[in-house]
Design a protein with these regions (language model features):
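Catalytic beta-strand/loop module used to bind and position nucleotide/cofactor moieties
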Residues: 2-9, 13-203
Length: 203
């Protein structure tokens, strides 16, 4: 099992109660991704974008390099409050010995900055954007975040392959729906929606 390198990256977990119940948690990973991306842009990393549903990426020609990712775990009662833990990881300084074990294109903040990157500064900015975003999301849902996502969408207009079960089909990305699903146009020109739980999307 490959372990994460010591003192090289940012790993952050935030636990929060959501009064809207379990239904409110739909779209939470998108909101956390928006906040994280906006935080990094606020630190001068203007090329960071979002790859649906939960990756922080940087465009590299026709492809994308992964900078970080998010994971959300939640639970609670359908009619009561819910709790969720948001986990976030960002590559800051990838050690050479760790880089050899990565099987996908990646990038770290050190490669994007001429100056040393402070992990403390990254965490402080992340929390300054994430905590207010979670409060707004609990009160208002996903709707006010949709335009912010569109401004950060790294898949917009890209040709994709949607992998579903044992098969895959070509599509082009159209943005996200009101519930956070990925909107795509398939090879026959039909608009379809892809939900995070049953497919993966590869640009």
């Amino acid at each position: 099992m490959r372990s994460s390198p010591l003192a090289a990256h940012v790993y952050l977990s935030v636990a929060r109660r959501f009064d809207g119940g379990l239904a409110r948690l739909g779209g939470l990973s998108l909101v956390a991704g928006i906040a994280a991306c906006e935080a990094l842009r606020g630190l001068g990393f203007g090329d960071v974008g979002l790859k649906w549903p939960n990756d922080l990426v940087v465009a590299d020609g026709d492809g994308l390099r992964k900078l970080g990712g998010l994971l959300v775990e939640g639970g609670g009662e359908a009619a009561g409050a819910a709790r969720a833990v948001i986990g976030l990881g960002i590559n800051v300084r990838m050690p050479a010995e760790a880089a050899g074990g990565i099987d996908q294109p990646w990038i770290d903040l050190a490669a994007m900055s001429p100056q040393p990157v402070s992990r403390n500064a990254v965490v402080a900015m992340l929390l300054s954007r994430l905590l207010p975003a979670l409060q707004q999301f609990d009160a208002e849902g996903l709707a006010p975040f949709l335009p912010r996502y569109a401004a950060l969408d790294a898949l917009a207009g890209r040709a994709l392959r949607v992998h579903e079960g044992d098969g895959a089909w070509p599509a082009s990305a159209l943005g996200i729906a009101a519930d956070g699903a990925l909107r795509v146009r398939d090879g026959e020109g039909r608009e379809r929606q892809v939900h995070a739980g049953d497919v993966s999307v590869r640009a």
